[in-house]
């Protein structure tokens, strides 16, 4: 990682199988076991691995930011048990890693985007209300704002909502709109 990128100051961790549906309509006992395995291998394990490797470099330089992409499914049932468990694991990893890095100058956060206009969301746009959606670049602006904050360590271990960061730091989406933060109750 260090050789490929010349060092790590900031890292965003998002892992998912491209093309997967957001939720699956069948209950967990009707799900194929490979879905659970894939969710934890491509999501949780990859988050742990990338954070571990990135943290080593950041600890050496006594600074850095790791933003693990998660979602409200960590805190509320949103249609799929494996998805919710993987997001909850991501949030727990973030809190515990942040605790272990507290004295190392490295910040870890869980970052919740809103409804992101990915290719699959746009393909199925009739199923979604896109009026409060976010571009794929919006979450990147949230990370850039965090990375520019000299007091970002005070947020370490927290769950942050990208749209709330837009309001706090004063950035909008690429279309000029300011997405409204989605709350747990609305998710």
Predicted features by range, described:
Residues 51-52, 95:
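A short, exposed helix-loop element centered on a Lys and neighboring polar residues
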Residues 91, 101-116, 152-160:
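Conserved Rossmann-fold SDR core element
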Residues 1, 67, 108-111, 121:
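Hydrophobic structural elements of the Rossmann-like NAD(P)H-binding subdomain
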Residues 110, 128-187:
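C-terminal helical subdomain
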Residues 6-7, 13, 17-35, 40, ...:
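Catalytic loop of short-chain dehydrogenase/reductase
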Residues 58-61, 102:
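Helix-to-beta-strand junctions that scaffold the AdoMet/dcAdoMet cofactor pocket
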């Amino acid at each position: 990682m260090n050789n490929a990128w010349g060092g790590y100051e900031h890292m965003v961790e998002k892992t998912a199988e491209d093309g997967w549906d957001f939720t699956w309509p069948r209950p967990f006992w009707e799900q194929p076991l490979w879905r659970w395995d894939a969710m934890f291998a491509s999501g949780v394990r990859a988050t742990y691995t990338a954070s571990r490797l990135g943290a080593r470099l950041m600890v050496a330089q006594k600074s850095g930011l790791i933003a693990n992409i998660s979602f409200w499914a960590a805190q509320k049932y949103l249609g799929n048990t494996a998805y919710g468990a993987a997001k909850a694991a991501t949030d727990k990893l973030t809190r515990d890693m942040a605790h272990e890095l507290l004295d190392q100058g490295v910040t870890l956060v869980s970052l919740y985007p809103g409804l992101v206009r990915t290719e699959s969301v746009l393909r199925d746009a009739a199923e979604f209300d896109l009026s409060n959606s976010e571009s794929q670049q919006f979450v990147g602006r949230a990370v850039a704002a965090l990375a520019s904050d000299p007091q970002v360590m005070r947020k370490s271990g927290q769950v942050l909502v990208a749209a709330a960061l837009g309001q706090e730091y004063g950035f909008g989406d690429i279309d000029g709109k300011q997405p409204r933060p989605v709350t747990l109750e609305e998710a």
